[in-house]
């Protein structure tokens, strides 16, 4: 049996090959990625170099999962159980062994069991795909409403933050729309995790409509406050020509 040692990790090479079709290498991070999302990654830890090399050699996906407890670097972190499988679409392998990757979110999954006998986590997973991606005849309004609120949200953010780039294309397919909205929403990661765990696309879109309505109200208040402040010419401050001497 060939023993491979990489960066201090000694392991049986043939053990890695025993991953079944329903097993997936896991990468716990401080990020929630949705299907269709692009995620650049810089791989420097030896265990994840090993994981990425395995995925490249075997044409395998790996899973991006939000950290529930622990840190990205060091000991195995405890992940949330729902994440997104990603495909490596571009890789730049550096001379010192580090890698720069571009990954693309493929589909959601749920972890049913975690293996901890390898340098990196491996999850036994099942696909978490909604069966209501096509709206019934009486359910078109949520998509229309979501797009209206989403456009307003993007415009408000762009006005408040010049560095914010308004999205150019908004999909009309409900699943793609809901994933894009979830990606763009500037909300806490735990709130995003709740979104990714919502299996039904209609329920996900309904939750996003609530969030967009809330965030739009908040952004409008911030914008009104800024405009009100800007109306007052600071040059007429009574302290302008005052001297402390």
Q: Can you say where each PLM-predicted feature lies in the sequence?
A:
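N-terminal low-complexity, acidic/polar interaction/targeting segments
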Residues: 2-245
């Amino acid at each position: 049996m060939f023993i491979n040692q990489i960066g201090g990790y000694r392991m049986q090479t043939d053990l890695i090959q025993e991953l079944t079709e329903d097993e997936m290498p896991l990468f716990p991070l401080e990020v929630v990625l949705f299907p269709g999302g692009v995620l650049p990654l810089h791989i420097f830890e030896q265990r994840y170099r090993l994981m990425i090399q395995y995925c490249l050699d075997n044409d395998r996906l790996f899973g991006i999962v939000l950290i529930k407890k622990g840190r990205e670097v060091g000991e195995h972190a405890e992940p949330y159980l729902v994440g997104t499988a990603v495909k490596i679409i571009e890789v730049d392998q550096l001379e010192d062994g580090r890698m720069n990757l571009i990954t693309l979110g493929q589909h959601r999954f749920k972890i049913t069991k975690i293996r901890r006998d390898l340098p990196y986590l491996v999850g036994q997973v099942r696909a978490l795909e909604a069966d209501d991606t096509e709206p019934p005849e009486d359910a078109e309004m949520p998509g229309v409403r979501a797009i209206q609120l989403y456009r307003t949200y993007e415009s408000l953010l762009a006005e408040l933050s010049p560095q914010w780039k308004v999205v150019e294309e908004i999909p009309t397919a409900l699943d793609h729309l809901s994933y894009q909205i979830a990606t763009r929403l500037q909300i806490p990661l735990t709130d995003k995790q709740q979104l990714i765990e919502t299996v039904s696309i209609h329920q996900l879109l309904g939750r996003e409509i609530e969030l967009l309505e809330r965030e739009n109200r908040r952004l409008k208040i911030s914008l009104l406050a800024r405009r009100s402040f800007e109306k007052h010419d600071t040059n007429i401050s009574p302290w302008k020509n005052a001297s402390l001497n």
